[in-house]
Amino acid sequence: MTAQTKAKFQASMIPLIAIMTALTTVLTMLVKLPTPTRGYLNLSDAMIFFSAYAFGPWVGGVIGGLGPALSDLLSGYPQWAAFTFVIDGLQAVLVGLIVRKFRPANMIAGSVIAGVWKVFGYFIAGGILSGWGPALGEVAGNAGQMAVGLIIAYALFAAVRKAYPPLVRMGNLGVQPTVTIPEDDAAASNQQTGVSDETATAKPDTPAGAGH
């Protein structure tokens, strides 16, 4: 990838990150179940997992961290925003790094490992903000939120991967484009190597009786 191509690719990522961050924020705010630690359960995991599957660890990490953190700020939970950015962002990074193949077992295992980190991270954050008792009581709820998000994300990613492959080519699980060599380039290559089109495409004569 040339420097110019790389710069164009990076510039094209900005609108994508902005759109996906906005979608993640909205979905996180759409369903909110208040918890004893003055936080709330939500559907952010679905977009965190999807972003990591589709766009890889680093872009997914930015989306996964910013979207839920903005939801905290807009929903009246500013004390959680910094914790959310770090915990959810690292969750997406872990998923993007661990999950390498589009296979249910691989995706579930990697996502569960990242989900365990999230449950642990929110337990620590909840203990700091509201005490260890209430934080311990939310472990089951956070685990359930992770499981629901994983199911939604897997179904959504599988559908998008099939319907519109270019959207998910940046991640490890995307459908990679097929590389074809234009005829003009192939002809030029043959000329450089001294091979004519006829020679390149001709099949050698098979002597009579030489077949198997």
Describe each PLM feature range:
Residues 1-212:
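Loop-helix junctions at membrane interfaces
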